[in-house]
A protein has these predicted regions:
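Hydrophobic membrane-insertion alpha-helices, especially the h-region
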Residues: 2-21
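Short, exposed beta-strand-loop hairpins at the edges of beta-sheets
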Residues: 127-129, 133-149
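Extracytoplasmic/periplasmic/luminal assembly and interaction segments
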Residues: 44-89
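Structured, soluble extracytoplasmic/luminal domains of envelope-associated proteins
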Residues: 72-120
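Short, solvent-exposed aromatic-acidic interface loops
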Residues: 35-37, 60-67, 94-101
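Tryptophan-anchored aromatic micro-motifs
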Residues: 24-45
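A short, polar/proline- and glycine-enriched secondary-structure boundary/capping micro-motif
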Residues: 41-42, 67-74, 101-105, 147-151
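Short, hydrophobic/aromatic-rich segments at coil-to-beta transitions
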Residues: 23-31, 54-59, 89-90, 131-137
Length: 151
């Protein structure tokens, strides 16, 4: 019985905290190119995800087209996240910074982006599956949205 207690003690104080700590401090740094088409409207952008220690930022840079009109997109979405279980992450936007070169009208942004990308204190769930040590598939609901290439 003493051996079992000693083994449990060793496993708990050496192995388990490392596993818990690894889940709490997921570090993800990757970049995805994404195109979105809604009728005559199109967005082509690069999304850079930087996540570590329950906070992160998504840097968005690209262009949007509506007929002959062309708009620049340049935004930074700062957020906190919580790993709910497995690969399920709940993100909460903290600050959304629109860079001066961003010319996308707010109405068009609202029509084509979830509010998480536009306003503070908005929530969004992502499934983030590791493909290998650096790359990830990021899904919204059950639809893969980004293949994110790591560094």
């Amino acid at each position: 019985m003493k051996k079992i207690k000693w083994l449990a003690f060793l496993l708990f104080f050496t192995g388990l905290p490392q596993q818990v700590d690894a889940n709490a401090n997921d570090k993800i740094v990757c970049e995805a190119k994404h195109s979105l088409y809604h009728g005559q409207f199109a967005i082509k952008a690069t999304y850079r995800f930087i996540m570590n220690d329950n906070s992160g930022v998504i840097l968005i840079n690209g262009t949007a087209h509506l007929g002959p009109e062309r708009y620049a997109i340049s935004r930074e979405v700062y957020f906190n996240y919580k790993r709910q279980s497995g690969d399920d992450y709940l993100l909460t936007s903290q600050r959304v910074y629109t860079n001066p070169i961003d010319t996308l009208p707010e109405l068009l942004a609202q029509q084509h982006y979830p509010s998480f990308f536009l306003k503070e204190n908005k929530k969004l769930n992502f499934l983030i599956n590791s493909v290998n040590q650096t790359d990830y598939i990021i899904s919204f609901v059950s639809t893969p949205l980004f293949y994110c290439n790591g560094e």
